[in-house]
Amino acid sequence: MSVNMDELKHQVMINQFVLTAGCAADQAKQLLQAAHWQFETALSAFFQETNIPYSHHHHQMMCTPANTPATPPNFPDALTMFSRLKASESFHSGGSGSPMAATATSPPPHFPHAATSSSAASSWPTAASPPGGPQHHQPQPPLWTPTPPSPASDWPPLAPQQATSEPRAHPAMEAER
């Protein structure tokens, strides 16, 4: 009865190994026998393709998993597929691709004006605050007075707060002059 029990245990281990590793039953049996029926050792040998102390050099080739998703694709084929995916993505998903391209290209026309208004308002006082700390509003108007002719049409729609800060800056500049 002990021999049958060991045989049953071995058969259960083989079935479990086949389910876990995804290999054939004869491969599982050979690996388990070579690993002295130690499941983890046989499984590790199967996935790492390490040599078991017994010489099975020609057998190791047959023990490599054939149905695992980790099989690497052919590199040139993968590059071709990626290039096709990129090209088809831009053409097929034109509805979703063009808004992404539009958002990628449209902010630069808006960002330079927003950058000149908001970043200039935030960067010029910090750059000009060391020469005149109490004259915080004085450096802004001289820098803004040359620029309003070009973006003057964009300023009221973009930021009404900038328009309200502009009149405050001009009286402060004129009062200090």
Swiss-Prot record:
<comment type="similarity">
    <text>Belongs to the UBALD family.</text>
</comment>
<protein>
    <recommendedName>
        <fullName>UBA-like domain-containing protein 1</fullName>
    </recommendedName>
</protein>
<feature type="region of interest" description="Disordered">
    <location>
        <begin position="89"/>
        <end position="177"/>
    </location>
</feature>
<dbReference type="Pfam" id="PF22566">
    <property type="entry name" value="UBA_8"/>
</dbReference>
<dbReference type="InterPro" id="IPR054109">
    <property type="entry name" value="UBA_8"/>
</dbReference>
<dbReference type="InterPro" id="IPR039310">
    <property type="entry name" value="UBALD1/2"/>
</dbReference>
<feature type="compositionally biased region" description="Low complexity">
    <location>
        <begin position="112"/>
        <end position="138"/>
    </location>
</feature>
<dbReference type="InterPro" id="IPR009060">
    <property type="entry name" value="UBA-like_sf"/>
</dbReference>
<feature type="compositionally biased region" description="Basic and acidic residues">
    <location>
        <begin position="167"/>
        <end position="177"/>
    </location>
</feature>
<feature type="compositionally biased region" description="Pro residues">
    <location>
        <begin position="139"/>
        <end position="151"/>
    </location>
</feature>
